[in-house]
Amino acid sequence: KFERYNMITIDEFKNKITKKSRLIGLDLGSKRIGVAICDEYQSIATPFKTLQKDNFNKFLDELKLIINENNIKGIIVGNPINMDGSLGPSAQSVKDVCVNILKNINIPLCLWDERLSTVGAFNLSSQLDIKVSKKIKNIDQNAAAFILQGAIDYLKN
């Protein structure tokens, strides 16, 4: 039964979506979940919103609504791989959440290496001269956009 809910590789993901598919990117934190969406041509990822993680059913309902309202065809989830390439407890937690998402939402889902995504999102907002308070407030959705952008850039090649 568990195999049905396995995540697929980015290359398998690429084969399951069309070139004109909007995708959603998720940065699963311990308290918040950053959400980003890309355009149908998979050119640019845009920060969308931050969801709270305290109630999984509420999160799932919000995720389903976002997916339906935005015609999303695939999910990219940041995979918190350690800097040395190993998988720690955070990676297992993300996989557990992904399995639960897949039990409830029937579109392709794959994990994408999220190393340094939060740092990258923070640095990008620094380059754009965004106030620190706003950077921190939006860091989760910006990290999700950073993750999603990396994945869609890979998918284009």
Label each PLM-derived region with a short phrase.
Residues 6-24, 31-157:
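Phosphate- and other anionic-substrate recognition elements at nucleic-acid/protein interfaces
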